[in-house]
Design a protein with these regions (language model features):
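Type III/flagellar secretion export determinants
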Residues: 1-177
């Protein structure tokens, strides 16, 4: 393995993953966004785990999966906080059902979820849904009555997953030679 640092960019070039996962009203400025990178020390840890797993005939064991989950969480929006805000509003009597959400304007929904998130109600077709978007315009959550919440992975999360799995695969493959 070389000692280069691998970074990913959510705008299709492989250079930098930058996202802000703030769900509070004090959003970070674009220049202050969190940046994730596959550092040398992280890559060394992945190589160590891949070698250990290869020795035990396990592919992507629990330690690697936990590491991957922790790294992805660094770029993921705080979905639990967003869901909590919605649930709190629903149970407080402010909004009782999807009909009341439909009547709420987009501005109210955006105030509920906080900057930098935006929300949109869709009430046509076979059912109604509430869609929540991050500052990049990516849908991160959808709520439908009767089904509940559905998480959608962001490009940044996908980039981190891909970088970690690639580093692991290469190390595992080398260890099996």
């Amino acid at each position: 393995f070389s000692s280069e640092v691998i970074e990913m960019n959510i705008s299709n070039a492989i250079n930098t993953v930058s996202v802000s996962g703030s769900s509070s009203s004090s959003a970070k400025k674009t220049s202050e966004k969190n940046k994730w990178q596959l550092t040398d020390s992280l890559k060394e840890k992945i190589v160590e785990l891949a070698k250990k797993d290869a020795k035990n005939n396990i592919y992507m064991g629990n330690e690697f999966m936990n590491l991957r989950k922790a790294e992805v969480a660094k770029v993921a929006p705080n979905r639990a906080a967003l869901i909590g805000k919605f649930n709190q509003s629903m149970s407080s009597g402010n909004m009782g059902d999807m009909k009341e959400i439909q009547e709420a304007d987009k501005r109210w929904l955006c105030i509920l979820f906080g900057i930098p998130y935006e929300a949109e109600y869709q009430g046509e077709g076979t059912g109604s849904a509430l869609h929540i978007y991050n500052e990049e315009g990516e849908e991160v959550l959808t709520y439908t009555q009767g089904v509940g919440w559905h998480e959608k992975e962001t490009k940044a999360e996908t980039g981190v997953h891909s970088a970690l799995k690639l580093a692991y695969y290469e190390a595992y493959h080398d260890a099996r030679k």
